[in-house]
Structures are given as C-alpha cells and as structure tokens.
Amino acid sequence: MTVFESLMNKLTEKGALHFSLLDPDKVTMDKFIELAKGAEKAGSDALMIGGSYGVNEGTLDNYIDAVKQEVKLPIILFPGSVAGLSRRADAVLFLSVLNSTDPYYIIGAQVQAAVLMAKHYSNLESIPMAYIIVGEGGAVGFASYAKPIPFHMEDVIVAYALAAYYMGFSAIYLEAGSGAREPVPSSVVAKVKRAVRNKILMVGGGIKSPEAAYSIALAGADVIITGTVIEESPAVVLKDIVDAVHRGGLRRLSNSNENANAWVNDK
C-alpha cells in the first residue's frame, strides 16, 4: 500500500488528518528528534519535513535516519528546492506554486526535480500537489516569488483551486505562511472544498489554537498542517490541536452521513 493510499484510508476513518511540519534548518538534530517524537505522541498522522531555505540532501538524510529510529510515522518531504530530496523519506509532495510570478516555481524546478527523481530517487512516492499561497504568505511567499491572494478575494482563491482540480493534482494546499497572524478563514476553506470535491484539501499557516484547527477541519480541510506551533509551544498545545483536528473531521463525517440519510429518507 502506498503512503497516499494509507493516508486516504485514515482520512476515511477520521474525517481529517494532522501533519506536523518540521524544518531541519531551524533546530539541532536532538531537538528535531524530540519534536518528531512529540508529534507522534500527540497523535499526528504524518511528518512533513522541509523548509523554505537552507536544506540539503545530506542534512535531510541524517535527520531522517535519526528520526526513523525513534518514530513510526510516515515521512513526507516538503521541498523548498530541488535540493530538498532524500531517498530516506517515504514520499514527496511534488508541488507547483500556482500563483508564483516566476515560471521557475511553477514548472522549472519541477522539470529539474523530475529528472533527479527518475535517475536517483525512484524509491520516493510522488504526491502531485498544487500549492496556493494566500493571506500574508510568509517566508515561502518571498522565497517562491508568489503573489499571495488576500483572504477576502475568495473567488480568486477558488478559481486557482479549480485550476488545480482540472489539471489533475491529487492534493491542493492553501498556505497562509509559516507564523502567519491569521489562518485561512473557514469560509474560504468551505468554498474551496465544495469546488474541489474529492481532491485532498490541505490547509496550513497561522493555525495556533485548537479552536482554529477544529473550525478549519469542520469547514472541509482534509489535512491540517502546523509547524511553528510545534517549535514554540508546549507539547500539550500540539496534542490539543491534533485532537481538535480529528474532532472536527469526525463531526464533518457525521454531518455528511446525516445529510445522506436525510436525502434517502426524502426519496
């Protein structure tokens, strides 16, 4: 079973998943291992590893090898450049920054990475992902020369998500930016999810409280990603956020089942 299939099975059970994002460039290896173990203990469903700057294959290999000795969660690469690949990982988010103003981040880096994948990283499972940077955008917005879409321009965000849907991406990621002051609004999440239907909707950036996590999961996010809160907050905060993601997902599943039953009863 592939990583994607395994996560889809979990999604069917839980309604929403939580991924912990860890950046090897920001912490020592010992701290990195500590954070990974904390994420697993908190109930996170997968580890995303990567960053906007400064990560290379050698560093990734060492960090991933160390983490794999301590945790059993799937490790998914979230590369900020073609240097962010590692044979030690289980899968990679093969992403395109749809609203970058530089073609390199839309297709150029992907062409380079594709050749590397075919020649040297054939063991890595590829998960095609459309990356749409919204709100403040954070460091990744600067690094990828993106033009972040303001939250109030909901129709524009939906239009980009629809483009990803019709282009056949498996997953669509709405990114508000690492450490953003506000997360993607639930109203935006709900509209995008209605538009992209069965595609995996990922949401990250600025999610610092259980209340925000629950609201976003309930609105339609299939996967919620937190990174900064893992590095800056006590482990209990992460557990509360993970629990809130799963509660929101289960509530959404329950609502869907109730609506389906009501439709059947009306017939």
Swiss-Prot record:
Location(s) in or outside the cell: Cytoplasm
One protein family per Pfam: PcrB
Alphabetically ordered keywords of this record: Cytoplasm, Lipid biosynthesis, Lipid metabolism, Magnesium, Metal-binding, Phospholipid biosynthesis, Phospholipid metabolism, Transferase
Binding-site list for Mg(2+): 23, 52
Gene3D superfamilies cross-referenced by the UniProt entry: FMN-linked oxidoreductases
Major place of residence: cytoplasm
Biochemical pathway: Membrane lipid metabolism; glycerophospholipid metabolism
GO cellular component terms, A-Z: cytoplasm
EC number: 2.5.1.41
Catalyzed reactions: sn-glycerol 1-phosphate + (2E,6E,10E)-geranylgeranyl diphosphate = sn-3-O-(geranylgeranyl)glycerol 1-phosphate + diphosphate
Any one GO MF annotation of this record: magnesium ion binding
Cofactors that this protein relies on: Mg(2+)
Function summary: Prenyltransferase that catalyzes the transfer of the geranylgeranyl moiety of geranylgeranyl diphosphate (GGPP) to the C3 hydroxyl of sn-glycerol-1-phosphate (G1P). This reaction is the first ether-bond-formation step in the biosynthesis of archaeal membrane lipids.
NCBIfam families according to UniProt: GGGP (TIGR01769), GGGP-family (TIGR01768), PRK04169.1-2 (NF003198)
Protein name, entry field: Geranylgeranylglyceryl phosphate synthase
Species classification: Archaea, Thermoproteota, Thermoprotei, Thermoproteales, Thermoproteaceae
